[in-house]
Swiss-Prot record:
Record's signal peptide: none
Gene name tied to this protein: aroB
Cystine connections: none
First-listed, main subcellular location of the protein, grouped into a coarse class: cytoplasm
Source organism per UniProt: Shewanella sediminis (strain HAW-EB3)
Catalytic reactions on record: 7-phospho-2-dehydro-3-deoxy-D-arabino-heptonate = 3-dehydroquinate + phosphate
Protein name: 3-dehydroquinate synthase
Top enzyme class: lyase
Origin organism lineage: Bacteria, Pseudomonadati, Pseudomonadota, Gammaproteobacteria, Alteromonadales
GO biological process, one term: chorismate biosynthetic process
Its biological purpose: Catalyzes the conversion of 3-deoxy-D-arabino-heptulosonate 7-phosphate (DAHP) to dehydroquinate (DHQ).
Localisation per UniProt entry: Cytoplasm
Amino acid sequence: MKQIQVDLGVRSYPIIFSQNLMSCGEHFARYLQDKNILIVTNETIAPLYLEKLQTVLSSFNCVAPVILPDGEQYKTLEQMDSIFTSLLQQNLGRDTVLIALGGGVVGDMTGFAAASYQRGIDFIQVPTTLLAQVDSSVGGKTAVNHPLGKNMIGAFYQPKMVMIDIDCLNTLPPREFSAGMAEVIKYGIIWDAEFFKWLEDNIEQLKSLDAQALTYAIGRCCEIKAEVVARDETEQGVRALLNLGHTFGHAIEAEMGYGVWLHGEAVAAGTVLAANTASGMDLIDESIVCRIIKLFEAFDLPVSPPNSMNFEDFIRHMRRDKKVLKGQLRLVLPEAIGQAGIYCEVSDELLETVIRCA
């Protein structure tokens, strides 16, 4: 078992990861003693792992779980209300711990419910998708979507623990695995050139779900995320770099309809748009763009946006991006493999050219 600490003072917490972790109840003990426990999961994950987790936690006071529909299109206030209703109907108070068993949607909704219910209760992340394991479960971003924008309603609220069972990836559909790899690749682009090169050299090992390769990749991503969050918890500075590709990507998700493109797919296409924008500003040369595209393609990820989207479609959604400051669009752009920056003065003319030529 490996452990990484997210250092946030009194709100610090561990990320633990290994194979077969979900069979080990002792990792939960310190957080669940004398607590009521409500597991939140979805219709896809429940048949795979709910009973297993309930069995491991049988010595604790687990109440009836909440099983949500599966998909980004259900990441709404309406669906989150079912968590609140369950808490209230079961007369659960502040001595309750929520456990998010699932991917990013389950984790985001459970975390936001924990932040909101009775002004804050504890929660634990048990991410079952690659994307959630390397990104969304760590750092305390919790939210639901709005028809006008992704993750627009939410809070920063840290979990008590993140427990990553790498064996969960054995039941992950290939398309979902590829979507998670988009976020893995992102870390190499913005932070760690050696890690990017390692990914280029270990494509087949990762695609075959080699446990050693997955353990290293997930661990490195969590190390980077923990370091960034410790330096900038509420995204006032360096944490914004983690949004590489997301401004374009969120526009794709919102325009196409949540769930049509997986989040990681939209991030991959958005990252290529960001790389081409950086190339157009002479921040990087074309060889770097080609390396980024080649690595995304190796994991069967899209490298261009939907044909149906034009510049006007993108810019309408991008103007609502959470990084917009005083009405000015701010884009995360690569400056090299392993380095990125935030840019405010990107002309509409360049963006239109990049999108039109994609």
